[in-house]
Every structure is written in structure tokens, then in C-alpha cells.
């Protein structure tokens, strides 16, 4: 997997974190450096750790699905992408009610925004991709996108539209990466 694909994957995965960060930034009237750091650090850390967990799990079963690994990666990426696209059209309010940069809420948001990365880690194992570079890129991109999302959300009147558009774009990118994987395996 080349660097541009890894970067696109990282950007797509960071869209959930970005969308939540925009909403959190909109909700937090006083956005301090400490709050920015806490949310950005945790989102980046969880986004980096979840693919490792998925990759390690995937390595255990990769020999059983080797002939179909590209299909597994395609299905997982498309499933994640489709869910992100579906969620981008969700009209229910997802703005946190309490400080999202503290305590259990911070951990739960970090987990929720990084679950897609778990499945991506499994896909990377199926494709026999080294995990080191993707993990670093995914973590750094998530950290930066969270930081930017917090700042944007804090300066906007309505965070919902930008956050949902980011989630829609992220879902589309994941689906395109899935199609690219099939193309690389000469499926079409």
C-alpha cells in the first residue's frame, strides 16, 4: 500500500473524529489549549491503537482467508464507508451535552470515533500490509483533524452541516479505497 493510499485512508478515518470535534468545539464556549490537547491526543491515540488491535486479530485468521483477502478488505471498507455516509444523513442531534474533553465521555467518544479503524486494521492484515506506517499516519492525521475540528466548531454558528459533510466525504473515500483494492487484485 503506497503512502498516498495510506494518507487517504487516514483522512477518511479521521472524518468521524473531525465531525465529533466540530460538534464539541461548537458546544464548548471556552476552548482552552488543555481541552484541545486532551481531545486531539485521545482521538489520535485511539485511532492509532485500534488498527493495531484489528491488525493483530486479522493476522491470526489471514491464512484462512488469503484467497479472498481483497474481498474481505473491500467489504469491510465499503461497510464502514456506507455506515459513515448513512450517519451523515442522520438528523438526530449528536452534540455532546457535557464536556467531551473529560472523563468517561472522552474515553467513550475516543472509542466511538475509532471503531472504524479497528476494522481497517483487520483489512490491513488481510492485505499483508505492514502496520507501522499506517498507524503513525492514522494517529497523526486524526490528531490534526480533531484539533482543526475543535477550532472550526468553536468559531462556527452551526457545526452540524460541516461535520456531516466531512463524514459523507470520509465514507466515500473508504469506499473508493475498497474499489482500488479490488482493482489492484485484478478483479476488474
From Swiss-Prot:
Pfam family, one: Mntp
Disulphide connectivity of cysteines: none
InterPro entries noted in UniProt: Mntp/YtaF, Put_MntP
Topological category with respect to the lipid bilayer: Multi-pass membrane protein
Organism domain of life: Bacteria
Transmembrane region(s): 6-26, 36-56, 60-80, 106-126, 131-151, 168-188
Gene Ontology terms, MF aspect: manganese ion transmembrane transporter activity
Keywords: Cell inner membrane, Cell membrane, Ion transport, Manganese, Membrane, Transmembrane, Transmembrane helix, Transport
Subcellular location: Cell inner membrane
GO cellular component terms attached to this protein's record: plasma membrane
Xref: PANTHER family: MANGANESE EFFLUX PUMP MNTP-RELATED
Family membership noted in the UniProt record: Belongs to the MntP (TC 9.B.29) family.
Cited function: Probably functions as a manganese efflux pump.
Protein name: Putative manganese efflux pump MntP
Species in which this protein is naturally found: Desulforapulum autotrophicum (strain ATCC 43914 / DSM 3382 / VKM B-1955 / HRM2)
Amino acid at each position: 500500500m503506497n503512502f498516498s493510499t495510506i494518507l487517504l485512508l487516514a483522512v477518511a478515518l479521521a472524518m468521524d473524529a473531525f465531525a465529533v470535534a466540530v460538534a464539541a468545539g461548537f458546544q464548548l464556549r471556552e476552548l482552552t489549549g488543555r481541552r484541545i490537547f486532551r481531545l486531539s491526543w485521545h482521538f489520535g491515540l485511539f485511532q492509532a491503537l485500534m488498527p493495531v488491535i484489528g491488525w493483530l486479530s486479522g493476522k491470526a485468521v489471514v491464512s484462512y482467508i488469503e484467497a479472498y483477502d481483497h474481498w474481505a478488505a473491500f467489504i469491510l471498507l465499503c461497510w464502514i464507508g456506507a455506515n459513515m455516509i448513512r450517519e451523515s444523513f442522520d438528523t438526530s442531534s449528536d452534540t455532546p451535552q457535557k464536556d467531551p474533553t473529560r472523563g468517561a465521555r472522552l474515553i467513550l467518544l475516543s472509542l466511538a470515533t475509532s471503531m472504524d479503524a479497528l476494522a481497517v486494521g483487520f483489512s490491513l492484515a488481510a492485505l499483508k500490509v505492514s502496520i507501522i506506517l499506517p498507524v503513525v499516519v492514522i494517529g497523526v492525521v486524526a490528531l490534526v483533524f480533531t484539533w482543526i475540528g475543535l477550532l472550526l466548531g468553536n468559531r462556527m454558528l452551526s457545526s452540524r452541516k460541516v461535520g456531516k459533510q466531512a463524514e459523507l466525504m470520509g465514507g466515500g473515500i473508504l469506499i473508493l479505497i475498497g474499489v482500488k483494492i479490488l482493482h489492484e487484485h485484478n478483479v476488474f
